[in-house]
Every structure is written in C-alpha cells, then in structure tokens.
Amino acid sequence: DACLDNKVKIAIGIGTDKAVSPLNTYGATKLLAEKLFVTANNYIDPDKHRTKFIALRYGNVVGSSGSVIPKFIQQLQNKRELTVTDLQMTRFSITMDEASDFILQATELGQGSEIFVPKLKAYSLLDVKTALNNIFGDYGTNNIGIQPGEKLHEILISKDEMRYTWDFKNMYILTNPLHSTFHPN
C-alpha cells in the first residue's frame, strides 16, 4: 500500500534461488514472498495506480553475510581446515556490482509481474576450495555432509516455470501467466 499511496513507479522484490522448489521453511517463505510480490499487479486498479511490482531472483551475493567464500578465506587465513558439507555441491553467485547493474536492467524492462533471473554459471565447492587453496594453502578439509533442508544443486528456474520464461540477452524473464504484459523487443 505504501508504494501505491506514494505513487512509486516500480517496486522491486529481491529474492533467492532458494525459492525454487524449496526443501525447507526458509525457501518456502522466499517462494511465498516472491509470488505475493509479483501477484500484487493482479490486484491493483491500473486507472488509479501506476506502480509496477517486479522481482529479481539470483544466487549468493559474493561478499554478503552468509556467503561461503569469506568464511573459507577466514578459515584458511587462520590456517584451519575448510569445513564443507559436500565438495560436489553447486551454487550460483553474483558480485555486488553485477547485482546492482541487474537491478537497473530489470527496472528498465519491467512491465509488472515479472521475475528477472540473471544467467549465472554454477560452481562447485570443489572449484572454490581448489582456487582458494592455490592462494592461501591447503590445510585439509572437514566434510560434514549435506545438512537437512539443503540441496546438493540449487536451480534458478523450475521446470514448471520454464513454460512462462523468456530467454532475453543476459537474463531470463519469468512472466506471470495470469498477468503477463512483458514482450521483449
């Protein structure tokens, strides 16, 4: 309501790949937040309100709190073994600058109800471990195993969402099947 009352042109909900086929409560709440946010476009009166609600979905932001790389660097700088769940685990990441640029691109393209997903390459924990060991040295690995609610491989778009997805330049654009106004140039 605050966005509508203050005539905000575009409202952006920033989400995570954890929202795709969630296995735990965190992922489920991210999915629900994303759906509620973009579905807001279905309930506004376009004659009264001009606010467009869009969402962005990406992986880990490099250097953010909870990101694995700073944790690994700290362990290696302290000459401790790396604590990993599974070296075959894959994740997606985006830098702060890439995330900022992506937000700007999405605001330029957004018509309302879309979920914007950057094209990101997956990396494995083994790739990260190898690269960091080359820089800081190898102090061993403590494999603790995949934790409850974790996925071995995150995904950015579900199979069901693919039916409503546009492949557009450096991104994928998921349209709302109930309120799709997006058409790429």
PLM features: what roles do these ranges have?
Residues 1-51:
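N-terminal Rossmann-like NAD(P)+-binding domain of SDR-like oxidoreductases, especially those catalyzing
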Residues 39-185:
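Strand-loop microenvironment adjacent to phosphate/nucleotide-handling motifs in alpha/beta enzyme folds
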